């Protein structure tokens, strides 16, 4: 199990990393393929973030999946915790973990709202281009800068 800590949260995941590459892992209940609204394939995994002071309070998740030939990130925040900076805090911590613990070089995001786009941009993702299947959506890309 991997653990990530931020100033307000603890994130936990059963992701599997072998030789720097993400492998299939146990996925949290409730993760859906948002484009076809069907249960995920099992190649997905996520970090669930909980309140440090109330470990039963689930705040948000950052998910990762291999789809459309790309490693994609998805995320969501529980309603009571929205617009309080939790998602950006979790995504920044996840990106640091991802860069440190994998040898992957590119991570893709496909935001579904202005708020999601804003979070990706604040975390260093750059606009890439329109989504091939729906030109009303756009790809954003995060390139790892390793030292």
Residue positions per predicted region:
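GNAT-family acyltransferases
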Residues: 1-80, 92-115, 126-147
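Glycine-rich acyl-CoA binding loop
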Residues: 83-88
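Conserved active-site tyrosine of GNAT-family acetyltransferases
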Residues: 120
């Amino acid at each position: 199990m991997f653990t990530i800590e931020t100033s307000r949260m603890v994130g936990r995941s059963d992701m599997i990393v072998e030789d720097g590459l993400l492998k299939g892992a146990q996925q949290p209940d409730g993760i859906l393929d948002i484009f076809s609204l069907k249960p995920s394939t099992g190649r997905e995994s996520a970090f669930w973030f909980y309140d440090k002071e109330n470990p039963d309070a689930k705040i948000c998740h950052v998910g990762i999946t291999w789809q459309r030939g790309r490693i994609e990130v998805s995320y969501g925040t529980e309603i009571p915790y929205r617009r309080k900076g939790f998602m950006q805090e979790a995504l920044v911590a996840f990106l640091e973990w991802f860069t440190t613990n994998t040898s992957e070089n590119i991570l893709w995001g496909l935001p579904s709202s202005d708020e999601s786009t804003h979070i990706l941009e604040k975390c260093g993702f750059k606009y890439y281009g329109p989504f091939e299947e729906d030109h009303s959506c756009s790809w954003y890309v995060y390139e790892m800068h390793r030292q």
